[in-house]
Amino acid sequence: MNRASTRKIRAVAKHVRMSSNKARRVAHQLRGCTYMEALSILNWMPHRACYPILKVLRSAAANAYHNMGIDKGFLFVLMAEVNEGPIFKRFRPRARGRGYPIQKPTCHISITLEDVTDSNSIMVKK
């Protein structure tokens, strides 16, 4: 097996203060895209989840360049996943001295990029 075609680069952001469902709908759009396509998708989408996902994507590309010397033009998004993180539990003051619980969800965003310099099989986005 050719070593150059199997290099994978990963970046993770943990405890992002956002619902995992809201971040997932953005992350699903990135799978199978090249790095440049994913950047343009994230720059034009109007969702709040785009900014932390964009930071993770840029971090993964920087890891590829600095750690392995891979040019950003040869990267594509192999996997973009969003998992649930811990939930911050707080209380909201209400009338008559009561308190109602509120939950502030967090999520973990991880993006895996793959180098396709010697590989001819780039996944086609469906």
Curated annotation (Swiss-Prot):
Q: What name does this protein carry?
A: Large ribosomal subunit protein uL22c
Q: What does this protein do?
A: This protein binds specifically to 23S rRNA. The globular domain of the protein is located near the polypeptide exit tunnel on the outside of the subunit, while an extended beta-hairpin is found that lines the wall of the exit tunnel in the center of the 70S ribosome.
Q: Recall the taxonomic lineage recorded for the source organism.
A: Eukaryota, Viridiplantae, Streptophyta, Embryophyta, Tracheophyta
The UniProt keyword set, sorted, is:
Chloroplast, Plastid, Ribonucleoprotein, Ribosomal protein, RNA-binding, rRNA-binding
Q: Name one GO biological process term.
A: translation
The protein's matches in SUPFAM superfamilies, at most eight in alphabetical order, are given as: Ribosomal protein L22 (SSF54843)
GO cellular component entries: chloroplast; large ribosomal subunit
Subcellular localization: Plastid, Chloroplast
What organism is listed for this UniProt entry?
Cryptomeria japonica (Japanese cedar)
Give the family this protein belongs to, as stated in its UniProt record. Answer: Belongs to the universal ribosomal protein uL22 family.
Q: Which GO terms describe its molecular function?
A: rRNA binding; structural constituent of ribosome
Q: Which NCBIfam families match?
A: rplV_bact (TIGR01044)
